[in-house]
């Protein structure tokens, strides 16, 4: 009997500790809007997010993986409760009210994408163009869904060069040079002034140029030619911005790789 009572008390203690951890985690995330606020200027800067999560984990004294996994569970639970009713009895519903705006923005963006997709599906395309267009699946490096991972979308890409991919049995065939390429151009959010934006573009390009390796493989040359052809279809301003987005993405990948080593 004494053993059973002790076990029950331990279970209650563990439950209280877990609840306190949840409350501490919710409060820590609330103080760091870069994690949840979609309008935050660093919301899509996943390296900055990784640094923030590392700081939260160190503050709470809990492994980073446990923090991110638990937060995803809490956030998804709150989103479901919010969809069901405005006055949920879930224990953390009031503490997580700061997520309401970001979740609504996310759902509105999804509705907008669905509406655009329906309009595109209703448009009748020229049969000859449908036969010429070659569909390739590419990773959209600029779109980030609510779970923070990159999305994959099917887009019609055409170019006059072949792309050779290592360990891939199929090669992407070339399409007619007279056909205009179609590609995804993300909406740009300018959080800073035009002068600061131009300075940042120049500084980023200079840093990247200083770090470029001289040894380039045939595969990389092939890919570079395709990217160059796509950039040449843009205006001067759009071309410069596209270069900066690509360079920043690669720089973030390098920083994240270094972060994961430690």
Swiss-Prot record:
Any single biological process term in GO: regulation of transcription by RNA polymerase II
Keyword Transcription regulation: yes
Major localization listed first in the record, in broad terms: nucleus
Compartment(s) where it occurs, according to its Swiss-Prot or TrEMBL record: Nucleus
Function comment: May play an important role not only in the regulation of Adh expression but also in the transcription of other genes.
PTM remark: O-glycosylated; contains N-acetylglucosamine side chains.
GO molecular function, one term: transcription cis-regulatory region binding
Pfam families: MADF_DNA_bdg
Protein species of origin: Drosophila melanogaster
InterPro entries given in the database record: BESS_motif, MADF-dom, TF_Adf1
Residue stretches making up the BESS domain: 217-256
Gene this protein is translated from: Adf1
GO annotations of cellular component type: nucleus; transcription regulator complex
Keywords on record: DNA-binding, Nucleus, Transcription, Transcription regulation
Record's protein name: Transcription factor Adf-1
Chain residues forming the annotated DNA-binding region: 24-104
Record-linked SMART domains: MADF
